[in-house]
């Protein structure tokens, strides 16, 4: 669905951003986090559906499961709050972002799903580390 159709979710995330509570957005959570950070979404001509979507960075490629019809507009050069972490190699859309200052990141796919439930395990381990660090230095 269209993440802009649920402004209350965006407002909730904006409130969480201000509290600096760690956030890991997945799929629509990625889109809502992006909107809360000032990025924009757009409707894909053909949605990303299925189990064979290559995403990655210069050093790492993963095959992911995806099911969405919207994506984030690539205007990261304007928005200095976040940086690009991953792209979708099929169409160059944004597949992952991270906040420059606070413990927030998100991905535009399902790391908990097939093709391999352990392929993206590093994301969950990263989130656990962020929680542990945040707890230690308590932003809360």
Where in this protein do the model-derived segments appear?
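Acyltransferase
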Residues: 112-140
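Cysteine-nucleophile active-site neighborhood
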Residues: 1-63, 71-74, 117-119, 123-126
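Active-site glycine-centered loops adjacent to acidic/histidine catalytic or metal-binding residues
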Residues: 27, 68, 110
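Acidic beta-to-alpha connecting loop that harbors the catalytic carboxylate
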Residues: 1, 111-112
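Short FAD-binding loop at a beta-strand-to-alpha-helix junction that anchors the flavin cofactor
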Residues: 103-109
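Secondary-structure boundary motif
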Residues: 18, 77-78, 133
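Catalytic beta-strand/loop cores that center a nucleophilic Ser/Cys/Thr
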Residues: 60-102, 140
